Swiss-Prot record:
Organism classification: Bacteria, Bacillati, Bacillota, Bacilli, Lactobacillales
Name of this chain's protein: Oligopeptide transport ATP-binding protein OppF
Pfam families referenced in this protein's UniProt entry, alphabetically: ABC_tran, oligo_HPY
Organism field: Streptococcus pyogenes serotype M1
EC number: 7.4.2.6
GO molecular function term, any single one: ATP binding
Amino acid sequence: MSEKLVEVKDLEISFGEGKKKFVAVKNANFFIKKGETFSLVGESGSGKTTIGRAIIGLNDTSSGQILYDGKVINGRKSKSEANELIRKIQMIFQDPAASLNERATVDYIISEGLYNFNLFKTEEERKEKIKNMMAEVGLLSEHLTRYPHEFSGGQRQRIGIARALVMNPEFVIADEPISALDVSVRAQVLNLLKRMQAEKGLTYLFIAHDLSVVRFISDRIAVIHKGVIVEVAETEELFNNPIHPYTQSLLSAVPIPDPILERQKELVVYHPDQHDYTLDKPSMVEIKPNHFVWANQAEIEKYQKEL
């Protein structure tokens, strides 16, 4: 079994206080192994991006632990510890147009992390790093003097990927990196991410709402609903044997590229009130080897009979 790089234990993230308190994530538990792509899938507002932002330190946590390489990272950190984490953990944002500084050249955008953390000794070394990174993500060296608005959406996302990977990170959080792109460009960006992972030994947390996309790139998938992770399994296991009703409803909504089969398929509608957790409280349980489901004792017995 591969070594755990990231581990989330009993994580809760809330915003506001008192009557205005909103719990965005509750009882989140999962781990990410070195070198794998772990996907977090859910609808808009489910809390998936909130978890990603908490891991990188952009969101505060209310309780629970986030461990990176065995060390707790969501508590107080010294400046040197924080800087080391920023270098090791990078993020690719959803909207490339909004996440890039429109007033800065591509050269400066990609170099900013190198400047901030003194990751080069000479100007020639910096230029060489940037030139190599541009080539790796499929951009030309003459693009360095241009500004973000001069590029297409796919090219802007490649700039965002270059900005993250030039730091030579170990772990990359990809927050819906293709949702703002044209369909024709999405496969190119996904293939680029997979190639960079293979070449550099990267570990990914891939955040998305499209199950057909995560099937292509993921080793394991966690399904999240209203701040609660309801199911975690290896990719093909989850697609072939979904157990939680919410996962079943998500999978039933994935389009089938066959008009006859698409018309014949039955949509599964998820009703949260079908769960009775008043007395019999749920927890994350391993129903099958490496297949975890959020359920109480009555549901566990029901799911096991259906296997």
